[in-house]
C-alpha cells in the first residue's frame, strides 16, 4: 500500500483502495481509509446505504490499491494467480523509472 491518495481529487474518491473478498468480488462501498506501516483501516464510504459485510478475524480480503509503486518495488517478480490462488505465471519486474 501507499500513502498516496491518488483519487482524492477525483469525482469518486476510493481512499487508499477498494476492498474485495478473496475471490476478487468487490465489496460495495468498503474502502481502505487509512494505512500505517503494519496495518490498514477499512470503513464504509461516508453516506453509503450498503450493508456492512460479515467479515470475521482471519477472513482473507484483497485490496485494489489506487497506488502501489512502493510495494511493487520491493519485489523482484510478481506472481499471477487465478481464482483458485494457483500461480499461473510469473512476471519479472521492470527496474528503473
Label for each model-derived stretch:
Residues 1-97:
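Active-site anion/phosphate-binding pocket segments in diverse small-molecule metabolic enzymes
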Amino acid at each position: 500500500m501507499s500513502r498516496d491518495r491518488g483519487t482524492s481529487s477525483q469525482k469518486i474518491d476510493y481512499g487508499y483502495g477498494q476492498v474485495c473478498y478473496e475471490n476478487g468480488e468487490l465489496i460495495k462501498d468498503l474502502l481502505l481509509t487509512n494505512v500505517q506501516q503494519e496495518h490498514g483501516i477499512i470503513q464504509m464510504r461516508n453516506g453509503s446505504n450498503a450493508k456492512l459485510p460479515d467479515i470475521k478475524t482471519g477472513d482473507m480480503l484483497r485490496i485494489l490499491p489506487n497506488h502501489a509503486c512502493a510495494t511493487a518495488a520491493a519485489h523482484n517478480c510478481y506472481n499471477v494467480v487465478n481464482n483458485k490462488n494457483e500461480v499461473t505465471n510469473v512476471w519479472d519486474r521492470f527496474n528503473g523509472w
